[in-house]
Amino acid sequence: MEQMAHPSSTPLLVAEIGNTTAMFAVFSGTDPIDSLQVATAALSSPEAVGELLQPLLARHSLAADAVISSVVPRAGEAAGRWLLDILPGRVLAVDSTLNLPFRISYDPPSALGADRLSLCARCCMLEEEAAVIALDIGTAITFDVLSADRSYLGGLIMPGLELMASALHERTAQLPRVEVSRPERLMGLSTADCIRSGVVWGCVLQVEGLVRKIRGWLRSEHGEGYARVVATGGRAPLIVSMMEMPPLLDPHAVSRGARYLFELNRITVS
Protein backbone atom coordinates (compact mmCIF):
# COMPACT_ATOMS: atom_id res chain seq x y z
CA MET A 1 0.00 0.00 0.00
CA GLU A 2 1.31 3.42 -0.98
CA GLN A 3 0.24 7.06 -0.92
CA MET A 4 -1.09 8.91 -3.98
CA ALA A 5 1.34 8.99 -6.88
CA HIS A 6 1.72 12.18 -8.90
CA PRO A 7 0.51 11.58 -12.46
CA SER A 8 2.99 11.95 -15.28
CA SER A 9 2.24 14.43 -18.07
CA THR A 10 3.59 11.95 -20.64
CA PRO A 11 0.71 10.35 -22.59
CA LEU A 12 -0.13 6.83 -21.41
CA LEU A 13 -2.21 4.27 -23.29
CA VAL A 14 -4.69 2.48 -21.02
CA ALA A 15 -6.42 -0.68 -22.27
CA GLU A 16 -9.61 -1.62 -20.41
CA ILE A 17 -10.72 -4.97 -21.82
CA GLY A 18 -14.08 -6.22 -20.58
CA ASN A 19 -16.13 -9.28 -21.44
CA THR A 20 -18.14 -7.48 -24.13
CA THR A 21 -16.33 -4.26 -25.03
CA ALA A 22 -12.80 -2.91 -24.83
CA MET A 23 -11.78 0.71 -24.35
CA PHE A 24 -8.37 2.03 -25.35
CA ALA A 25 -7.79 5.50 -23.91
CA VAL A 26 -4.84 7.87 -24.09
CA PHE A 27 -4.37 9.64 -20.77
CA SER A 28 -2.58 12.91 -20.11
CA GLY A 29 -2.43 13.25 -16.34
CA THR A 30 -5.56 11.86 -14.72
CA ASP A 31 -7.94 12.41 -17.64
CA PRO A 32 -8.41 10.67 -21.00
CA ILE A 33 -7.81 12.91 -24.02
CA ASP A 34 -8.73 10.41 -26.74
CA SER A 35 -10.24 6.94 -26.85
CA LEU A 36 -11.38 4.07 -29.02
CA GLN A 37 -14.08 1.52 -28.12
CA VAL A 38 -14.24 -1.84 -29.89
CA ALA A 39 -15.88 -5.21 -29.37
CA THR A 40 -13.65 -7.45 -27.27
CA ALA A 41 -14.21 -10.25 -29.78
CA ALA A 42 -12.35 -8.15 -32.36
CA LEU A 43 -9.11 -8.49 -30.35
CA SER A 44 -8.49 -11.95 -31.74
CA SER A 45 -4.77 -11.62 -32.50
CA PRO A 46 -1.88 -9.13 -32.19
CA GLU A 47 -2.38 -8.26 -35.86
CA ALA A 48 -6.08 -7.53 -35.31
CA VAL A 49 -5.21 -5.33 -32.33
CA GLY A 50 -2.69 -3.44 -34.44
CA GLU A 51 -5.18 -2.69 -37.21
CA LEU A 52 -7.56 -1.22 -34.65
CA LEU A 53 -5.03 0.74 -32.59
CA GLN A 54 -2.70 2.18 -35.21
CA PRO A 55 -4.91 5.22 -35.99
CA LEU A 56 -5.22 6.07 -32.27
CA LEU A 57 -1.49 5.79 -31.62
CA ALA A 58 -0.72 7.73 -34.80
CA ARG A 59 -2.58 10.67 -33.27
CA HIS A 60 -0.55 10.35 -30.06
CA SER A 61 2.98 9.48 -31.10
CA LEU A 62 4.41 10.58 -27.73
CA ALA A 63 2.61 7.72 -25.93
CA ALA A 64 5.46 5.34 -25.06
CA ASP A 65 3.97 3.25 -22.24
CA ALA A 66 0.80 1.23 -21.73
CA VAL A 67 -1.15 -0.48 -18.96
CA ILE A 68 -3.65 -3.27 -19.59
CA SER A 69 -6.62 -4.11 -17.36
CA SER A 70 -8.18 -7.20 -18.92
CA VAL A 71 -10.69 -9.82 -17.79
CA VAL A 72 -10.44 -11.74 -21.08
CA PRO A 73 -7.06 -13.52 -21.11
CA ARG A 74 -6.84 -14.15 -24.85
CA ALA A 75 -7.71 -10.55 -25.76
CA GLY A 76 -5.38 -9.17 -23.09
CA GLU A 77 -2.51 -11.32 -24.32
CA ALA A 78 -3.08 -10.25 -27.94
CA ALA A 79 -3.09 -6.58 -26.96
CA GLY A 80 -0.02 -7.01 -24.77
CA ARG A 81 1.99 -8.76 -27.47
CA TRP A 82 1.28 -6.08 -30.06
CA LEU A 83 1.95 -3.20 -27.67
CA LEU A 84 5.24 -4.75 -26.53
CA ASP A 85 6.35 -4.88 -30.16
CA ILE A 86 5.25 -1.37 -31.09
CA LEU A 87 5.85 0.82 -28.02
CA PRO A 88 9.35 1.91 -26.96
CA GLY A 89 8.47 1.96 -23.25
CA ARG A 90 6.79 -0.35 -20.76
CA VAL A 91 3.63 -2.44 -20.91
CA LEU A 92 2.16 -3.30 -17.51
CA ALA A 93 -0.62 -5.85 -16.92
CA VAL A 94 -2.83 -5.22 -13.89
CA ASP A 95 -2.90 -8.12 -11.41
CA SER A 96 -2.79 -8.72 -7.67
CA THR A 97 1.03 -8.89 -7.53
CA LEU A 98 1.36 -5.14 -8.13
CA ASN A 99 1.97 -2.52 -5.50
CA LEU A 100 -1.64 -1.63 -4.61
CA PRO A 101 -3.05 1.44 -2.81
CA PHE A 102 -5.20 -0.82 -0.61
CA ARG A 103 -4.67 -3.92 1.52
CA ILE A 104 -6.04 -6.97 -0.25
CA SER A 105 -7.79 -9.92 1.38
CA TYR A 106 -9.11 -12.39 -1.21
CA ASP A 107 -8.84 -16.15 -1.70
CA PRO A 108 -6.77 -16.51 -3.77
CA PRO A 109 -5.56 -12.94 -4.43
CA SER A 110 -4.93 -13.81 -8.08
CA ALA A 111 -8.67 -14.42 -8.58
CA LEU A 112 -9.56 -10.78 -7.95
CA GLY A 113 -9.97 -9.53 -11.51
CA ALA A 114 -7.99 -6.72 -13.10
CA ASP A 115 -11.17 -4.68 -13.53
CA ARG A 116 -12.00 -4.90 -9.83
CA LEU A 117 -8.41 -4.14 -8.80
CA SER A 118 -8.40 -1.10 -11.08
CA LEU A 119 -11.77 0.12 -9.84
CA CYS A 120 -10.67 -0.20 -6.21
CA ALA A 121 -7.51 1.74 -7.09
CA ARG A 122 -9.68 4.49 -8.61
CA CYS A 123 -11.67 4.65 -5.38
CA CYS A 124 -8.46 5.19 -3.44
CA MET A 125 -8.01 8.43 -5.41
CA LEU A 126 -11.05 9.96 -3.67
CA GLU A 127 -9.96 12.72 -1.31
CA GLU A 128 -12.48 12.08 1.45
CA GLU A 129 -11.59 9.53 4.11
CA ALA A 130 -14.61 7.25 4.01
CA ALA A 131 -15.48 3.69 3.15
CA VAL A 132 -16.28 3.09 -0.52
CA ILE A 133 -18.73 0.76 -2.26
CA ALA A 134 -17.53 0.32 -5.85
CA LEU A 135 -20.04 -0.85 -8.48
CA ASP A 136 -19.18 -2.08 -11.96
CA ILE A 137 -22.42 -2.53 -13.89
CA GLY A 138 -21.62 -4.40 -17.08
CA THR A 139 -21.96 -7.96 -18.38
CA ALA A 140 -21.76 -8.95 -14.72
CA ILE A 141 -22.39 -6.57 -11.82
CA THR A 142 -19.72 -6.46 -9.14
CA PHE A 143 -19.68 -4.79 -5.74
CA ASP A 144 -16.33 -4.25 -4.01
CA VAL A 145 -15.95 -2.63 -0.62
CA LEU A 146 -13.05 -0.69 0.86
CA SER A 147 -12.81 0.56 4.43
CA ALA A 148 -11.92 4.16 5.22
CA ASP A 149 -8.34 3.05 5.92
CA ARG A 150 -8.27 1.35 2.49
CA SER A 151 -8.55 -2.31 3.43
CA TYR A 152 -10.42 -4.55 1.01
CA LEU A 153 -13.41 -5.97 2.90
CA GLY A 154 -15.06 -8.16 0.27
CA GLY A 155 -17.43 -8.12 -2.66
CA LEU A 156 -20.50 -9.47 -4.42
CA ILE A 157 -21.11 -10.64 -7.99
CA MET A 158 -24.47 -10.87 -9.75
CA PRO A 159 -25.61 -11.18 -13.39
CA GLY A 160 -25.95 -8.05 -15.49
CA LEU A 161 -28.97 -6.90 -17.46
CA GLU A 162 -28.25 -8.81 -20.66
CA LEU A 163 -27.47 -12.01 -18.78
CA MET A 164 -30.79 -11.78 -16.93
CA ALA A 165 -32.74 -11.15 -20.12
CA SER A 166 -30.97 -13.85 -22.14
CA ALA A 167 -31.50 -16.42 -19.37
CA LEU A 168 -35.26 -15.85 -19.54
CA HIS A 169 -35.20 -16.48 -23.29
CA GLU A 170 -32.81 -19.43 -23.26
CA ARG A 171 -34.28 -21.28 -20.28
CA THR A 172 -37.97 -20.98 -21.20
CA ALA A 173 -40.02 -22.26 -24.12
CA GLN A 174 -41.83 -19.10 -25.23
CA LEU A 175 -40.31 -15.96 -23.73
CA PRO A 176 -38.70 -13.84 -26.46
CA ARG A 177 -35.22 -12.36 -26.59
CA VAL A 178 -35.57 -8.70 -25.61
CA GLU A 179 -33.26 -5.75 -26.13
CA VAL A 180 -32.70 -4.21 -22.72
CA SER A 181 -33.48 -0.50 -22.49
CA ARG A 182 -35.17 1.91 -20.10
CA PRO A 183 -38.79 0.80 -19.67
CA GLU A 184 -41.48 3.33 -20.57
CA ARG A 185 -43.64 2.34 -17.61
CA LEU A 186 -43.42 0.14 -14.53
CA MET A 187 -46.09 -2.35 -15.58
CA GLY A 188 -45.63 -3.85 -19.04
CA LEU A 189 -48.50 -4.25 -21.51
CA SER A 190 -46.73 -6.82 -23.70
CA THR A 191 -44.48 -9.78 -22.95
CA ALA A 192 -41.43 -7.89 -24.18
CA ASP A 193 -42.31 -4.86 -22.05
CA CYS A 194 -42.91 -7.08 -19.01
CA ILE A 195 -39.46 -8.65 -19.40
CA ARG A 196 -37.80 -5.28 -19.98
CA SER A 197 -39.46 -3.69 -16.95
CA GLY A 198 -38.83 -6.69 -14.72
CA VAL A 199 -35.17 -6.98 -15.65
CA VAL A 200 -34.34 -3.27 -15.46
CA TRP A 201 -36.36 -2.32 -12.39
CA GLY A 202 -35.35 -5.57 -10.72
CA CYS A 203 -31.71 -4.66 -11.27
CA VAL A 204 -32.20 -1.10 -9.98
CA LEU A 205 -33.86 -2.34 -6.80
CA GLN A 206 -31.29 -5.10 -6.32
CA VAL A 207 -28.48 -2.56 -6.53
CA GLU A 208 -30.22 -0.10 -4.20
CA GLY A 209 -31.08 -2.85 -1.73
CA LEU A 210 -27.56 -4.26 -1.70
CA VAL A 211 -26.05 -0.80 -1.23
CA ARG A 212 -28.30 -0.30 1.82
CA LYS A 213 -27.42 -3.76 3.13
CA ILE A 214 -23.68 -3.17 2.68
CA ARG A 215 -23.88 0.23 4.39
CA GLY A 216 -25.59 -1.40 7.37
CA TRP A 217 -22.96 -4.16 7.41
CA LEU A 218 -20.18 -1.58 7.33
CA ARG A 219 -21.70 0.20 10.35
CA SER A 220 -22.42 -2.90 12.42
CA GLU A 221 -19.40 -5.04 11.54
CA HIS A 222 -16.68 -2.47 10.86
CA GLY A 223 -17.76 0.73 12.63
CA GLU A 224 -17.79 2.76 9.41
CA GLY A 225 -19.95 5.86 9.70
CA TYR A 226 -20.35 6.67 6.03
CA ALA A 227 -19.76 4.95 2.71
CA ARG A 228 -19.32 6.67 -0.65
CA VAL A 229 -20.71 4.81 -3.67
CA VAL A 230 -18.91 4.92 -7.03
CA ALA A 231 -20.41 3.37 -10.18
CA THR A 232 -18.95 2.54 -13.58
CA GLY A 233 -19.55 0.09 -16.42
CA GLY A 234 -21.43 0.09 -19.70
CA ARG A 235 -24.85 -0.20 -18.06
CA ALA A 236 -24.12 2.13 -15.15
CA PRO A 237 -25.65 5.26 -16.78
CA LEU A 238 -29.02 3.51 -17.17
CA ILE A 239 -29.15 2.01 -13.68
CA VAL A 240 -27.76 5.09 -11.91
CA SER A 241 -30.29 7.35 -13.65
CA MET A 242 -33.13 5.29 -12.15
CA MET A 243 -31.81 5.13 -8.57
CA GLU A 244 -33.38 7.27 -5.84
CA MET A 245 -29.95 8.23 -4.48
CA PRO A 246 -27.59 8.15 -7.48
CA PRO A 247 -23.94 7.38 -6.72
CA LEU A 248 -20.92 9.08 -8.23
CA LEU A 249 -20.86 7.98 -11.89
CA ASP A 250 -17.41 7.70 -13.48
CA PRO A 251 -17.45 6.02 -16.92
CA HIS A 252 -13.64 5.97 -16.93
CA ALA A 253 -13.18 4.66 -13.37
CA VAL A 254 -11.46 1.39 -14.35
CA SER A 255 -9.14 3.17 -16.78
CA ARG A 256 -8.34 5.88 -14.22
CA GLY A 257 -7.54 3.19 -11.67
CA ALA A 258 -5.32 1.31 -14.10
CA ARG A 259 -3.47 4.54 -14.87
CA TYR A 260 -3.00 5.12 -11.14
CA LEU A 261 -1.62 1.60 -10.71
CA PHE A 262 0.86 2.26 -13.51
CA GLU A 263 2.07 5.36 -11.65
CA LEU A 264 2.39 3.44 -8.38
CA ASN A 265 4.43 0.76 -10.11
CA ARG A 266 6.62 2.94 -12.33
CA ILE A 267 9.80 1.92 -10.50
CA THR A 268 9.04 -1.80 -10.50
CA VAL A 269 8.28 -1.88 -14.23
CA SER A 270 11.20 0.29 -15.36
UniProtKB/Swiss-Prot annotation:
UniProt KW Ligase keyword: no
One BP term from GO: coenzyme A biosynthetic process
Active site: 115 (proton acceptor)
Encoding gene per record: coaX
PANTHER family for this protein: TYPE III PANTOTHENATE KINASE (PTHR34265:SF1)
Binding site for substrate: 106, 113-116, 191
Organism lineage: Bacteria, Pseudomonadati, Chlorobiota, Chlorobiia, Chlorobiales
Highest taxon listed in the record's lineage: Bacteria
Subunit description: Homodimer.
Residues that coordinate or bind K(+): 136
Full protein name: Type III pantothenate kinase
GO-annotated molecular function: ATP binding; metal ion binding; pantothenate kinase activity
Cofactor dependency: NH4(+); K(+)
UniProt keywords, alphabetically: ATP-binding, Coenzyme A biosynthesis, Cytoplasm, Kinase, Metal-binding, Nucleotide-binding, Potassium, Transferase
Subcellular location: Cytoplasm
Cofactor notes: A monovalent cation. Ammonium or potassium.
SUPFAM superfamilies: Actin-like ATPase domain
Reaction(s) this enzyme catalyzes, per UniProt: (R)-pantothenate + ATP = (R)-4'-phosphopantothenate + ADP + H(+)
Annotated GO CC locations: cytoplasm
Pfam families referenced in this protein's UniProt entry, alphabetically: Pan_kinase (PF03309)
InterPro entries: ATPase_NBD, Type_III_PanK
E.C. number: 2.7.1.33
